[in-house]
Every structure is written in structure tokens, then in C-alpha cells.
Amino acid sequence: MSKTWEHYKDAARHHERAAYHYKGAGKFDQAEEQFRHVLQANPRNPAALNYYGYMLADRGIRLDEATDLIKRAIAEDPTNAAYLDSLGWAYFKQNRFSEAEEPLRQAASRESHDPTILSHLGDLYAKLGKDNLAEAQWQKSVDEWHRVLPGNFEPERLAEVEQKISALKRRLAQQKTPGDAKP
């Protein structure tokens, strides 16, 4: 391989690592700039397409663009659970709940131990009024958060899911009428 090609590949890898770093640090503008460099070098990079699209969707901005990026990632790798989750989450953020269900269910089926995917599916079920299913998915998410490796553990994400379960239980308890009480 030529030195020019090697340099080009090294630069693309550098931009990709930088994009992930900036996104993780909450520096979204810098992350976007790096993702654009990565996709300029390889417009079919499924990981970059998905990560960039998910970053936009999760922030609730440019949702049509986010959905397009994620669909392009899925076109490259149609069975990737993370990409399916991202698509479902982008639809969720657009209030396209009926469209969100299938990709989120597929993602949870393929990656049944991913706490984020399980939480997203729980969020969808809550929006659809499927309280029992929402609680079940959120509980699975909590259980999986307790199993993740220390380097991947995100206590704030675990706390968010636990709060959703508590809020759902409080709401359901308030909806019960005195005639519903068991002796």
C-alpha cells in the first residue's frame, strides 16, 4: 500500500476516535465536525453513520437527518442491534411511536442484555400505554446495568431507569380506587 493511502486511513481513524471522544465529553459541535470528516473519507462507514445519527436523535435535533444517517448505517449492516435501536430511538424522538416499535423490538431480541436498548423499549411501551411491558423492560434494564463491567457502568443511566419504574408504580397506585384494594 502507498504511504498516501496509509496516511489517509490513519487520518480517518484519528477523526473517528476524536468524534467518539468529543461526543463522550459532551462536546457535540466538535464531535459533529469529526464525524463529517469520517464520513467524507468513507460515506458508508456504518459505525460513524449510526453514532452520528444517534447523537443527533438522542439530543432531539435534526431528527430527519438523524434518521437518514441511521438508515444508511442499517443499509450497510441490517442486523446490527445498535443500529436498529438507534432507528427506533430516532422514531421515538419524532413521536413516531408505531414505527419505533419494530426496530426496538428487533434490537432487544438481538441484544437482550443491553440496558440502553431495554430502557428505550420500556420508554416506548410507556408512551403506548403498555405499562406492564414498560415496567418489565425497565426492570430488565436495571438488572443488566447491575451486570455490566465497571468501565461501562453508567450510574446516572441506572438511576434514570429506576426513577421511571418508581414513577410508574406511584402513578399506578394513585389510579387504583378504594374498591380495588385487597383485604
Model region roles, listed by residue range:
Residues 3-7, 41, 76, 110-111, ...:
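Structural marker of alpha-solenoid helical repeat scaffolds
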Residues 61, 133-183:
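Terminal, low-structured helical/coil segments at or just beyond the last alpha-helical repeat
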